[in-house]
Amino acid sequence: MNIFEELKARGLVFQTTDEQALVKALTEGQVSYYTGYDPTADSLHLGHLVAILTSRRLQLAGHKPYALVGGATGLIGDPSFKDAERSLQTKETVLEWSDKIKGQLSTFLDFENGDNKAELVNNYDWFSQISFIDFLRDVGKYFTVNYMMSKDSVKKRIETGISYTEFAYQIMQGYDFYELNDKHNVTLQIGGSDQWGNMTAGTELLRKKADKTGHVMTVPLITDSTGKKFGKSEGNAVWLDADKTSPYEMYQFWLNVMDDDAVRFLKIFTFLSLDEIAEIETQFNAARHERLAQKTLAREVVTLVHGEEAYKQALNITEQLFAGNIKNLSANELKQGLSNVPNYHVQSIDNHNIVEILVAAKISPSKRQAREDVQNGAIYINGDRVQDLDYQLSNDDKIDDQLTVIRRGKKKYAVLTY
């Protein structure tokens, strides 16, 4: 099975320009290719991971990746399938975000070894050197307005309005391909399926300005089995930055993937072989309640993104919280595991009686209910049941001198901080 056949088998090929020519190029020698990442935030997220891992698969097959950070295009804003104009960021912000994204990409691509080691480029380096007049004369003349308006990404914005700034975005992305081909002999661009219009602007410019053929391959935008856009948890993006989405939160995200999606996601998001995945699928279908596919997915992706130690910590947090063993976890681990739990900051002047604290922290709705909860054995402090109405919180209840975990019943948690 050649690399293109494997990508197809994993569900990673959505659309290509001349497929036969692309397969020929990939099987006959080393291909230099690029994927672009606009710095629209200070971190990449799970939505970017499909293209990143596809790029890594091609590198493992001997091809040479260029990771393009869009320091210039990030200043403009991509209109593709957006309902409204993006807010423009300052140059300083975009350059800062660009540096952070460069650091994240080095986790996945090999920038050190071999003749196909990855290269980082930033399109701000060339766009900052081109005058507006030169750009119009040397690049703009190759694009008709009719051609630019025929793109689906633009059509959807015509009625609501699109600025010239965003309208010109596709020309800038097209010029990226031309520049990388001219300087580094890059002949293939990889990106999300929503980028098809912008990407083919590059092959068009190559053909007209340099009389060369370029290839484009898009990866699918991933949705779950209900058709919902994949990569968000509770409406929030799942970030690759551990400070924005903790390894534990990422682990839980993958653990909660639906049965109908789990095996498909193993093919897309892990480097397990297709034979290994087929074996997991057989075991998974025989005992779905054991969630083997989800557990494997969580292990593989968290290890890939954050490392083995982070995976082990996420697994330990999961197991200890499930067992109610709060005291077996550090304050930092509890902050990860209980990040979505209500917090109450205890002041030194507060009454530290258990009943008062339960009401103040909104664990129990009233003092009467709080007393009943304590007497009925429904209240736990750091995993230990408390039934004494006169119980006073003390330093002994602080984990690492930072927090106390209170549980009411089986599932209602609150974290007290000091």
From Swiss-Prot:
Keywords: Aminoacyl-tRNA synthetase, ATP-binding, Cytoplasm, Ligase, Nucleotide-binding, Protein biosynthesis, RNA-binding
Class of enzymatic activity (EC top level): ligase
One Gene Ontology MF term: tyrosine-tRNA ligase activity
CDD domains named in the record: S4, TyrRS_core
Principal localisation: cytoplasm
Highest taxon listed in the record's lineage: Bacteria
Record bears the keyword Zinc: no
Pfam families in the cross-refs: SYY_C-terminal, tRNA-synt_1b
Localisation: Cytoplasm
SUPFAM superfamilies (alphabetical): Alpha-L RNA-binding motif, Nucleotidylyl transferase
Motif 'KMSKS' region per UniProt: ranges: 229-233
Catalytic reaction annotation: tRNA(Tyr) + L-tyrosine + ATP = L-tyrosyl-tRNA(Tyr) + AMP + diphosphate + H(+)
Enzyme Commission no: 6.1.1.1
Motif ('HIGH' region): 39-48
Keyword Transport in record: no
Biological processes per GO annotation: tyrosyl-tRNA aminoacylation
InterPro entries: aa-tRNA-synth_I_CS, aa-tRNA-synth_Ic, Rossmann-like_a/b/a_fold, S4_RNA-bd, S4_RNA-bd_sf, SYY-like_C, Tyr-tRNA-ligase, Tyr-tRNA-ligase_bac-type
The family this protein is said to belong to: Belongs to the class-I aminoacyl-tRNA synthetase family. TyrS type 1 subfamily.
Subunit architecture: Homodimer.
Main function: Catalyzes the attachment of tyrosine to tRNA(Tyr) in a two-step reaction: tyrosine is first activated by ATP to form Tyr-AMP and then transferred to the acceptor end of tRNA(Tyr).
Listed name of the protein: Tyrosine--tRNA ligase
Gene source species: Streptococcus pyogenes serotype M1
